[in-house]
């Protein structure tokens, strides 16, 4: 079996597992990457991310070109046809190769009898492409988002919702964080230029650099030595608002995969940091990040709602709560989020966030700082959440971020800027 032929069927299987089984692409893709040659890994990733980014359009096309959906054991073929559409619409794969390889993918998934059907649908699309795309441009599916999310964005951002959706449908820029314990940002930018690459500093976040062109991490000067970390600019705002100091006791709650834990330690290398996350598997990445950067923190598995279970009676000078959320601010990085989330999830997440906030607030010392952060753009998880918390928590005061009526700072995703992110800085009276 040819590796290239197998590639399309692997992409179809990955997308099927996300859409039909609710699995995260970050869990599904790595084992499939192991099945292809190194030279094909980037294309497999591109096909998976691309199909999930444009799923609404590809589904719309299938409904137009097929009289009945593929179901049961033939369901993977449904997604294989989507992979074919995506290649024809969005990649540089020559059309004849895209057709041939996609049709051959039917053999890999043990549906060789459907090769003719796949070929026919893809060729019909080629013949009718212009007409179909003109019709699609006026359909509800053109936003490439589920309807419930479009409605929420329209309600929350009456004048900005289309800009948010457009940003979500773009490829994200690659942001890095320079480790200030090794280099100044300007110094590392010089090393980057020496390596033949160009980067741009962020105006607000002092360690953030955007690469002109995304690059593999092994090509970045000093990555293995811990000089630089891949982290979106907006995520770097957490440590900026937290402003950790040496010698302080700091809690990083919901810490995995450890990007913010290590940023705290870069800013305050002598801080005593406890990193806690409920997901034991993801905690392994916290250890990996600490090891690569040569840093030490206490790492524990635990549920943020029950601090006594993982820190006893310990109190903290600063707490970073990067709360579990809908992740609607990072859709451009994780397009599977659009299809993994459901409308009902938002109220459940808001309830969980409130429970964690109420549980950890008593662990903050008087005069201490808590930064509440999410990678969401939805008010229920952000401004509304903090407004309600301030109303029920008399010893909490807002600092630097917004006003009591409009608490927090909401970053929206866009262009070369950072992801969608929310921060509220709270001081204990």
UniProtKB/Swiss-Prot annotation:
Catalytic residues, chain numbering: 375
* Gene3D superfamilies to which the protein is assigned, alphabetical: Helix hairpin bin (1.10.287.730), NusB-like (1.10.940.10), Sun protein, domain 3 (3.30.70.1170), Vaccinia Virus protein VP39 (3.40.50.150)
Chief place where the protein resides: cytoplasm
Question: What PROSITE patterns does the entry give?
Answer: NOL1_NOP2_SUN, SAM_MT_RSMB_NOP
Q: Where in the cell is it found?
A: Cytoplasm
- Keyword RNA-binding among record annotations: yes
UniProtKB keywords = Cytoplasm, Methyltransferase, RNA-binding, rRNA processing, S-adenosyl-L-methionine, Transferase
One cellular component term (GO) for this entry is:
cytosol
Per the UniProt entry, the Enzyme Commission number(s) are 2.1.1.176
Q: What Pfam families does the database record attribute to this sequence?
A: Methyltr_RsmB-F, NusB, RsmF-B_ferredox
> What residues does S-adenosyl-L-methionine bind to?
254-260, 277, 303, 322
Ranges of Polar residues compositional bias? 400-412
Q: Which family does it belong to?
A: Belongs to the class I-like SAM-binding methyltransferase superfamily. RsmB/NOP family.
NCBIfam families per UniProt: PRK10901.1, PRK14902.1, rsmB
Protein name as it appears in the record: Ribosomal RNA small subunit methyltransferase B
The organism is Salmonella agona (strain SL483)
- What gene is it encoded by? rsmB
């Amino acid at each position: 079996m040819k590796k290239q032929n197998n590639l399309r069927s692997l992409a179809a299987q990955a997308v099927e597992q996300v859409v039909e089984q609710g699995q995260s692409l970050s869990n599904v893709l790595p084992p499939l990457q192991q099945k292809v040659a190194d030279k094909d890994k980037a294309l497999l990733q591109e096909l998976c991310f691309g199909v999930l980014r444009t799923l609404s359009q590809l589904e719309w096309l299938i409904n137009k070109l097929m009289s009945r959906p593929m179901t049961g054991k033939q369901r993977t073929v449904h997604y294989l046809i989507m992979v074919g559409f995506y290649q024809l619409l969005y990649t540089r794969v020559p059309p004849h190769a895209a057709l041939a390889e996609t049709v051959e993918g039917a053999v890999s998934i043990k549906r060789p009898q459907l090769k003719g059907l796949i070929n026919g649908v893809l060729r019909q699309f080629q013949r009718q492409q212009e007409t179909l795309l003109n019709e699609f441009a006026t359909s509800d599916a053109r936003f490439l988002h589920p309807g419930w999310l479009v409605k929420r964005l329209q309600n929350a951002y009456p004048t900005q919702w289309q800009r948010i959706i457009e940003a979500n449908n773009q490829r994200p820029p690659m942001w890095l964080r320079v480790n200030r314990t090794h280099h100044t940002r300007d110094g590392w930018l010089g090393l980057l230029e020496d390596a033949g690459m160009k980067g741009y500093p962020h105006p607000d976040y002092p360690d953030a650099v955007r690469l002109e062109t995304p690059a593999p991490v092994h090509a970045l000067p000093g990555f293995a030595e811990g000089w630089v970390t891949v982290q979106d600019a907006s995520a770097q705002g957490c440590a900026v608002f937290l402003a950790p100091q040496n010698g302080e006791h700091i809690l990083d709650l919901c810490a995995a995969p450890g990007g913010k834990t290590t940023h705290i330690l870069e800013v305050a290398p002598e801080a005593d940091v406890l990193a806690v996350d409920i997901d034991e598997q993801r905690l392994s990445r916290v250890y990996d990040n600490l090891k690569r950067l040569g840093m030490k923190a206490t790492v524990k598995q635990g549920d943020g709602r029950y601090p006594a279970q993982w820190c006893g009676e310990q109190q903290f000078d600063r707490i970073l709560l990067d709360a579990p959320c809908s992740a609607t601010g990072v859709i451009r990085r994780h397009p599977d989020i659009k299809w993994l989330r459901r409308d009902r999830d938002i109220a459940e997440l808001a309830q969980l966030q409130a429970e964690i906030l109420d549980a950890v607030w008593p662990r903050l010392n008087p005069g201490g700082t808590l930064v509440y952060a999410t990678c969401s753009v939805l008010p229920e998880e952000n401004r509304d959440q903090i407004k309600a918390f301030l109303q029920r928590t008399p010893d909490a005061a807002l600092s630097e971020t917004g006003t009591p009526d409009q608490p927090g700072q909401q970053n929206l995703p866009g262009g070369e800027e950072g992801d969608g992110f929310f921060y509220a800085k709270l001081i204990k009276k």
